[in-house]
Structures are given as C-alpha cells and as structure tokens.
Amino acid sequence: MTSLPDRGVSSSSSDPLCEGNIAPCSSSSEQKEDCSLKQSKTSILSCVFNSPFNIFEAHQDSSANKSPKSSSGSYDWLRVLRRIVCSGSMWRFLGTSKVLTSSDVWFLGKCYKLSSEESSSDSDSESGHATFLEDFSSRIWITYRRGFDAISDSKYTSDVNWGCMVRSSQMLVAQALIFHHLGRSWRRPSEKPYNPEYIGILHMFGDSEACAFSIHNLLQAGNSYGLAAGSWVGPYAMCRAWQTLVRTNREQHEVVDGNESFPMALYVVSGDEDGERGGAPVVCIDVAAQLCCDFNKGQSTWSPILLLVPLVLGLDKINPRYIPLLKETFTFPQSLGILGGKPGTSTYIAGVQDDRALYLDPHEVQMAVDIAADNIEADTSSYHCSTVRDLALDLIDPSLAIGFYCRDKDDFDDFCSRATELVDKANGAPLFTVVQSVQPSKQMYNQDDVLGISGDGNINVEDLDASGETGEEEWQIL
C-alpha cells in the first residue's frame, strides 16, 4: 500500500540531515530565505544547548527551489551543523516533529535508559541513545524493491505500493534468524569481511525464487490465503503463508540434503481453548512441545520455536484497553515485535517509548540486490537503516501479529510465565492466554488442527482487505 505520511530517507540509507537537507516552511521565496536562516541558527543552538537527542527533523524535497542568498548565507552554518551531527552520537526521529524524549525505550526485549540523569549514574546506560541507535541500525531492514525477476506468471518486477506486509513479515522473521544464529547482542560490524551466517541470512531474503524466503516464494506459498502479486493482505494470512513456506521448504531440504534451512519450529497461535469464535488466541504448551518434537524428527528434545500470534484488537481502531498490554510484550526477552501500522499500511514495529511505537518502514524503494550466500564482502547497506520512525500506538491498525522467539525449553517456560502474568493484568480481555493442553477430544495431533485451520481446510481471508478492517475471523477480539 501507499507509505505512511512521513518523509523518508535516501535509498542508500544515509541520514538526510547529513546530506544537508532542511525542512521547508513557506511557499514564497522571501519567506523561504528567512525561514532557512532561522532554521539553521536555531538548529545550531539546539546542538549546543540541548541534550544530544533533542535534534528536530530537518528534511526537504530535493526538487524544491532554493534562494541563492539563503544557499550562500546558510551553507557554511549547515556544514557546521552537518559535521556536528554526523561526527557524534546525536540522532533524531524522522517522520514527525517530535523529538526524542528522555523516557525509557523498550526495543525487542531490551530497555534503553535515555535520561541524562540515569545515564550519568548508571555505567550500563551511560550512552543510552548511542547504544540504542547501534542496536536499531543492526536490525535487518527489508523494503520495497524494484528490478527483480518477474513474480511467477505475473509481470510484476517490483512490489511498490502493495508489498509492505510481506516486507514487514520478512523483517520479523529475519530478526528471529539473527537472534538464533548470532544472538540478541549481535551488532552489525563496521568492517568487512562479514560473518558468513549474517550474509547467509540476507541471502535467504533476496528477491528471486532461488532465495528461500523471497517475496516470490512467500506469494506462492500463500496463494491459498489470498496472497498475490499486486494485492495487499492482512497479518493473519501472512502468518499462514509463512507456515506453509516453512513446511514446504523443510520437506524439500529433507529430500535433497537432510538439512534444515529454517532452524526452528513455527507455531501460528490462533483460536481458543474451546474453539469458540471470538476467544483470545491460546498458546498450548503441549502443542508447542509436539511441534518441537516433529521438528526434531520424533526426538523428545525441545527445539527453538518461533511463535506468531495474529490478532484483531478492535474494529475501525484499536481498543485502548489493549495498548498497555501490547507495550508490555516488548519487555519480554523473547520479543520479536509486531507486524502492524496504520490501516492498509504495514510496518515492522520493533519498540515503544511512552505512547509511541518505534518502527522500521518498508516503504523505501530500493533496487533489487543479489547477495550470494558466500559473499562475505557484499555491500549490505541497503539492509540497514539508522532512521527511527514513530507512530502513536492508538493509531495502529487493530489487525496485527505479534512475534516471539524462544531459544530453548527454559526460554519458552519464561515466555509462558510472563504471558500468564500479562493475562492477570488484562482485566478479562487478554491479548492471548496460555494453557497446558487442549481438551481430550482434541488430543490427537494434527498439524493443521493445532495450528488453527478449520477441518474443511478453508480460511476466510477475503475479509482481510486493504482497509485493514476484518470480518468474522475466529481469532477476532472485540
């Protein structure tokens, strides 16, 4: 779908402020000149007298006409400002006029204390804003691409304006793979050669049928759930597409080389304990154990597991009672963030601060790249972004999906404990619940059944349209 009404970054992922752009504020040339001078001086003063993270957005359409006088009069000041910002640890939010506050940031299970007072007294958070940006910019950023091979039998060689949900889901799954192979503390290195596992992960998300988790293969896997080139789908159908793709990919690899390309079990959580419509999704511990057993080819040992929990938390807008619960999921060490955004506009929400969601935006258009699995000298800059965008939590689409990664049995038990505590805080309206087992009548294991697919194999995905509104899905929460 169309992008959020934010101003974007360059396709090279560089910071627009470091490119000398300033915010437009008037249509007349005289007003532009005065405004430009005022902005330049004000920005300099902000850098000198304010905290390092009180830097306002400064971005301008490159096609705008510039006054000769303002160009010559403020260019030197702008160069000074650019040098100050680019050489230090300063950073800003882009997309709104809101500056970063000193409140704590929860980002994929990790807390960053940005208060200058707390930073000065706590050595672990001395450079909270800088360490957060390092973490943020190390996350895999997957965006619209153009110039790839046509998708299946279609003529689409780009996913611009319709592929944002696919790209958002790729980002979430990519983080799970990064956490699994490289750990939560991994940061993108500043020098080459890169870690082979890191390059291997990027290769899997390339834009061709040869790449395991490409947009081409996701659309093919999700065809029965309404995924098609040129069409937008909701998070529920997207989760089901991943379920199908992972299963198909696993079967193919077992036949060819006996290896697993997706190194964890996948559990799409939906339905309720009694199968009644309208109930909260239920994480069933026995089902998770069975999925891990199947992943390990019948062995009883626990395996890593990725949980995807699709939800609908309202009708036209999100029910406010769920917002505190959503925020708390980012405090879980197992957090992988949320597939969500404004209605019809998907983003990858990876953190929260106060009442704002912090996200990676897939709506930047970049050329398709081909990163070979063994090219440890590859240019990976188009897969990372240092621009943090924010969105009010009460504006996100009620149709979303939450992701969690549990490395082992202890990690899964910790997740269940935290989820149960969250249920206790929900006042009767939890995001999802946790139970030990399903009813005796449902004990016979069937992958489609335990993953929430109805007996006739049909799932109504037509209600998940571009407006973000939904119909009567069995997992809907009102």
Swiss-Prot record:
Domain of life, per lineage: Eukaryota
Supply the alphabetized keyword list.
Autophagy, Cytoplasm, Hydrolase, Protease, Protein transport, Thiol protease, Transport, Ubl conjugation pathway
Report the main location listed first in the record.
cytoplasm
Cellular compartment(s): Cytoplasm
In which tissues does this protein get expressed?
Constitutively expressed.
Q: Which InterPro entries match?
A: Papain-like_cys_pep_sf, Peptidase_C54, Peptidase_C54_cat
Per its record, the protein catalyses: [protein]-C-terminal L-amino acid-glycyl-phosphatidylethanolamide + H2O = [protein]-C-terminal L-amino acid-glycine + a 1,2-diacyl-sn-glycero-3-phosphoethanolamine
Cite the active-site annotation: 164, 361, 363
Q: Name one GO biological process term.
A: protein processing
Q: Which Pfam families match?
A: Peptidase_C54
EC number(s) stated in the UniProt entry for this protein: 3.4.22.-
* Cytoplasm recorded as keyword: yes
Q: Which GO terms describe its cellular component?
A: cytoplasm
- Annotated stretches, region: Disordered: 1-20
User: A Gene Ontology MF term for this entry?
Assistant: cysteine-type endopeptidase activity
Could you describe the subunit structure of this protein? Interacts with ATG8.
Q: Which family does it belong to?
A: Belongs to the peptidase C54 family.
Function statement: Cysteine protease that plays a key role in autophagy by mediating both proteolytic activation and delipidation of ATG8 family proteins. The protease activity is required for proteolytic activation of ATG8 family proteins: cleaves the C-terminal amino acid of ATG8 proteins to reveal a C-terminal glycine. Exposure of the glycine at the C-terminus is essential for ATG8 proteins conjugation to phosphatidylethanolamine (PE) and insertion to membranes, which is necessary for autophagy. In addition to the protease activity, also mediates delipidation of PE-conjugated ATG8 proteins.
What is the name of the protein in this document?
A: Cysteine protease ATG4B
The lineage is: Eukaryota, Viridiplantae, Streptophyta, Embryophyta, Tracheophyta
Q: Which gene encodes it?
A: ATG4B
